[in-house]
C-alpha cells in the first residue's frame, strides 16, 4: 500500500508541473544579464592619453597555472613609445584553449594593465582564433586618446601615470604647479 501511495505522490508532482508556465531562455537572441563581477575575456588597458599600461614584465605569464599567457617585452625608445615606462609588451598572447579563468594573472599585474571583461561569448569553430593576440586584447581607443606610439605627457613621470595624474590632455594642473591633491 505504501508503494502505491508513493507512486501517486510522484504522479501528483508531474501533473502539477504540467500546468505551470514554461520559462524559456531565448539565448542568443535575447541574452540575459551578466553578473557585474563575472570573469570573462581579458583586456589590456590604456592610460587616458592612449599609452598602454602593459610594461612587458611577464608577471602575468609567470602567475598563470595553465601556461596560457605568452608575453615578450621590448624597450621603448623616444621615437617609438608604447607605454610610459622603459618597456612595453611587444607580443602579448592569451590562449583561451588553456585559460581556466582563475584571475591570477590579474592579481599579478603591477600596473593594473590586465583586467577581465564581462564578455563571455568566446566560442569559435577554429582553434587558431582562440589564441588572442595583442590587437584583440587591447582596449579600444576612446575619441580623446592618441594612438601609440607617441611621447608621454609633457613633464609626466612613470609615477604620474601610475597614480592617475595623466589625462587625455596631459598632466593635471595640480601636479604641474607642485600642489598635492
From Swiss-Prot:
Q: Which residues form the 4Fe-4S ferredoxin-type domain?
A: 44-74, 90-119
Q: How is the cofactor bound?
A: Binds 2 [4Fe-4S] clusters per subunit.
Q: What is its EC number?
A: 7.1.1.-
Q: How does it sit in the membrane?
A: Peripheral membrane protein
UniProt binding sites for [4Fe-4S] cluster 2: 64, 99, 102, 105
Entry GO MF terms: 4 iron, 4 sulfur cluster binding; iron ion binding; NADH:ubiquinone reductase (non-electrogenic) activity; quinone binding
Q: Name one Pfam family in it.
A: Fer4_7
Q: Which proteins does it associate with, and in what oligomeric form?
A: NDH-1 is composed of 14 different subunits. Subunits NuoA, H, J, K, L, M, N constitute the membrane sector of the complex.
- In which domain of life is the source organism classified? Bacteria
Q: What is this protein called?
A: NADH-quinone oxidoreductase subunit I
Q: Which compartments does it reside in?
A: Cell membrane
Main location group: membrane
Role played: NDH-1 shuttles electrons from NADH, via FMN and iron-sulfur (Fe-S) centers, to quinones in the respiratory chain. The immediate electron acceptor for the enzyme in this species is believed to be menaquinone. Couples the redox reaction to proton translocation (for every two electrons transferred, four hydrogen ions are translocated across the cytoplasmic membrane), and thus conserves the redox energy in a proton gradient.
In Gene Ontology terms, what is a biological process of this protein? Answer: aerobic respiration
So which cofactors does this thing need?
[4Fe-4S] cluster
InterPro entries listed in its UniProt record: 4Fe4S_Fe-S-bd, 4Fe4S_Fe_S_CS, NADH_quinone_OxRdtase_chainI
Reaction equations catalysed: a quinone + NADH + 5 H(+)(in) = a quinol + NAD(+) + 4 H(+)(out)
Name the positions where [4Fe-4S] cluster 1 binds.
54, 57, 60, 109
Q: Which family does it belong to?
A: Belongs to the complex I 23 kDa subunit family.
Q: Which HAMAP family match?
A: NDH1_NuoI
Keywords assigned: 4Fe-4S, Cell membrane, Iron, Iron-sulfur, Membrane, Metal-binding, NAD, Quinone, Repeat, Translocase
Q: Which GO terms describe its cellular component?
A: plasma membrane
Amino acid at each position: 500500500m505504501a508503494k502505491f501511495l508513493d507512486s501517486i505522490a510522484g504522479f501528483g508532482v508531474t501533473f502539477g508541473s504540467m500546468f505551470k508556465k514554461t520559462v524559456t531562455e531565448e539565448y542568443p537572441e535575447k541574452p540575459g544579464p551578466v553578473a557585474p563581477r563575472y570573469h570573462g575575456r581579458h583586456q589590456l588597458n590604456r592610460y587616458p592619453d592612449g599609452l598602454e599600461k602593459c610594461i612587458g614584465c611577464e608577471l602575468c605569464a609567470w602567475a598563470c597555472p595553465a601556461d596560457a599567457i605568452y608575453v615578450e617585452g621590448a624597450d621603448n625608445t623616444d621615437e617609438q613609445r608604447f607605454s610610459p615606462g622603459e618597456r612595453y609588451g611587444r607580443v602579448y598572447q592569451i590562449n583561451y584553449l588553456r585559460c581556466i579563468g582563475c584571475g591570477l594573472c590579474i592579481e599579478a599585474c603591477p600596473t593594473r594593465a590586465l583586467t577581465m571583461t564581462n564578455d563571455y561569448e568566446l566560442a569559435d569553430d577554429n582553434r587558431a582564433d582562440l589564441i588572442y593576440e595583442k590587437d584583440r586584447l587591447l582596449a579600444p581607443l576612446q575619441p580623446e586618446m592618441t594612438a601609440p606610439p607617441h611621447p608621454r605627457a609633457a613633464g609626466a613621470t612613470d609615477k604620474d601615470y601610475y597614480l592617475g595624474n595623466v589625462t587625455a590632455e596631459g598632466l593635471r594642473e595640480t601636479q604641474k604647479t607642485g600642489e598635492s591633491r
